[in-house]
Amino acid sequence: MRLFALLPVLLGLISSHFVSATDNGKTTDVTWDKYSLSVKGERVYVFSGEFHYQRLPVPELWLDVFQKLRANGFNAISIYFFWSFHSASEDTFDFENGAHDVQRVFDYAKQAGLYVIARAGPYCNAETSAGGFALWASNGQMGSTRTSASSYYDRWYPWIQEIGKIIAANQITNGGPVILNQHENELQETIHSADNTVVKYMEQIKAAFSDAGIIVPSTHNEKGMRSMSWSTDYQDVGGAVNIYGLDSYPGGLSCTNPNSGFNLVRTYYQWFQNYSSSQPEYLPEFEGGWFSAWGGSFYDQCSTELSPEFADVYYKNNIGSRVTLHNIYMVMGATSWGQSAAPVVYTSYDYSAPMRETREIRDKLKQTKLIGLFTRVSSGLLQTQMEGNGTGYTSDASIYTWALRNPETHAGFYVLAHSTSSSRAVTTTSLNVNTSAGALTIPNIELAGRQSKIIVTDYQTGDGSSLLYSSAEVLTYATLDVDVIVFYLNIGQKGEFAFKDAPTHLTFKTYGNSKVSSAKSDHGTKYTYCQGDGTTVLKFSHGVLVYLLDKETAWNFFAVPTTSNPRVAPSEQILALGPYLVRTASVSGHTVSLVGDNANATSLEVYTGNSKVTQIKWNGKETPTKKTAYGSLIGSAPGAEHAKLSLPTLKSWKAQDTLPEINPDYDDSRWTVCNKTTSVNSVAPLTLPVLYSGDYGYHAGTKIYRGRFDGVTATGANITVQNGVAAGWAAWLNGVYVGGAIGDPDLAATSAELEFTSSTLRRKDNVLTVVMDYTGHDQANVKPNGSQNPRGILGATLLGGDFTSWRIQGNAGGEANIDPVRGPMNEGGLYGERLGWHLPGYKGSKTATSESPLDGVSGAAGRFYTTTFKLDLDSDLDVPIGLQLGASADAPAVVQIFMNGYQFGHYLPHIGPQTRFPFPPGVINNRGENTLAISLWALTEQGARLSQVDLVAYGAYRTGFNFNHDWSYLQPQWENNRGQYV
């Protein structure tokens, strides 16, 4: 490493607080010091959100998400690259087909104006199957994972080389958006020794990324305050990264008890001082929500986790702790479609994130925007020292304060919240602050329950104005033709502010319903008001314009960047107020053009700072425009409240048997013979031959086994199956149901003793068929072998005889990846899946019946239902559409939903909780024909049926974003070559 001066130092003006920046010896485009990260020589507050492109398999929608994040104050995204998604078999990698084309991730991020933090593992966790390890490698052949073992290294190294080259080409040094690269994921350094295998592993990763050409700084994410790992400032014996990070999920919230948890962690600052004091404080994963497990609560029920108060209190607490790199996990969770989920989650990965699984903006994201826009312009926040903290700063000891000070500009940032952060008390207090004008007491600061405020002092608000202090929170400011300051408060709360070095005899005019008064003080004129409903604007005689917004009005305020640079200067913004979303804004001649979305028609106020601009265009159409006395433009933005959303009733179903393998005479001669007597897996099988599905090249989805034996003396069989928690299975002897297990959300493996009767036995060629559901491969923390815990049958013992043979069938082609667009985890081994009945273009057999899923099946059996329907939504609408299912919880069953070939729903009605399954545009055709397929098999003789199968709309938005593409490249059609996989 080497040191160089980050900022030019004027002779004779060298500050005692000057800190040189550190680089990694490979590039000076990204540097750091103990305060913040710098990109291209400028400090930046990294306000980032976690997004997983694999969970939204429509590349065009990545730009939709990125634009929404940029509009809501984010300047970066953090992205996992899952090895499992790109590698179906050893030495094969797909970075081209459909959503596997990761170059588009980088291109869209750059277009939207977002930095990228790359996280390629090789292990990722992320509640994805096998934690992101390629499933072909997760059958045990990696040996001792996450160590320096050669068996592991030989498998992950090619992955890092392939994805690493793409990341390298998109580094900021090459004009791309990548500024940081993470090594591994939450890997604890429990033994600080250069000879330790985990330390050697981290050195291997460092070398591998370097071999791939990556030169931006490296990072890692500590798994909570559980160990001290990979910091150059603490027992560095090897494997350390450039910038240490700490993951934290402190909420402790409950979906069923809104009064639980909500306890802030106030020890981050000390932790970073102890273990990474020379580096900026970085939270690579901070709670944006939490995942939900099989049998738990659905995300929409988790009101506390979804609350905007969570974002307000927790994210501001991080600012008070001096964090300047802040990544929210997840900012949008999306969907664990196909067989990509780890067993700990069901299909939805909504995560209670600020952005809904359906790409809709929650109030939680709107509140987060208030913080993001503040950090964007608050340059003084990027170089602060901890002046103090505790309950002694306010007149009420129930309030806790963080006090930060910029040693060069002397700007102060006081972050207030209730000392008992879960408190719902409404408290009014005064705050003692230090300013350039001396010590002051700011009165009448009200904190509602679960509210936090950032009080600023000596805060620059433009080229010609500064605030001496303000008890109203700063949302943002802009330096346009005049300095524009935007404040926000809850309705009814009092605000007070004073300018620094303002002209004497300053006057102002008020536009709006908040009454503002001025009074002389020892430190100039102070302005006080009580926040009314909506917007009030103050126009001061020295040119400054002040917007006073109530909080919920502020949720619909946008400071739209006029640059694609993630670092936005206060002068590079157009201010807009009113709509649900403003994506972009630009000025041409006399017109300001805005592109955005609206659910309901709203007013639209725009401030450009350009007196020549007299006309507003919204989504390409002029809107009647008038000019206000303070220089803004007023128009309107239409909504979708009157849009006709006519979703068809699903009918004209075709049904076929999807478990013909139950029939003992079914021809399985093309199936894979299970004849191995040893396994690559270190977990020994309970019986032989080995019946682990991974040993035979079948990894994701349903598996079917057929065991044979002769004679009539067998009384039963002991079968143990392991296919993930909640995964059930069923068995048939010679076509007769003999038992199984319905699945348990607490058990990954289940056993059953199947009972045979003489009437079901044959003298020759008895066939035991075992069909099993699959909920994913485990993550690394699951004993005994983590991501390599075997799947399939662990043991099969015939009582009163011996099996003579076993065969297995899984997804069509196994590791061949015969559908590279949808990828290696989309399909399982059900007969209908293998033959492609779920794919567009499949017309159905002549023997298909007209039954629907509402008819269901009698007894332990399975059916595959298909239908088609057309949608013709307005071209300027974004309508998230899903499928609502219902079924009795007393009839155990396994249901899968396929939309245009994509498995976008795994429904277990007896376990739950998910019953509604959304489809993004591109998976569903909002303007065109769609193929819907549903597989249903009953786990018991009770049979099963669905009680509801309906298309539903989550919302409707008039939009300027183009959702009308030819999606055919994402929806390969059925081909008449699937018969080989019977």
Swiss-Prot record:
Cellular component GO terms, alphabetical: extracellular region
Keyword Ribonucleoprotein applies: no
Signal peptide extent: 1-21
E.C. number: 3.2.1.23
Chief location bin: secreted
Assigned protein family: Belongs to the glycosyl hydrolase 35 family.
UniProt name for this protein: Probable beta-galactosidase C
Source species: Penicillium rubens (strain ATCC 28089 / DSM 1075 / NRRL 1951 / Wisconsin 54-1255) (Penicillium chrysogenum)
Upper classification of the organism: Eukaryota, Fungi, Dikarya, Ascomycota, Pezizomycotina
Encoding gene per record: lacC
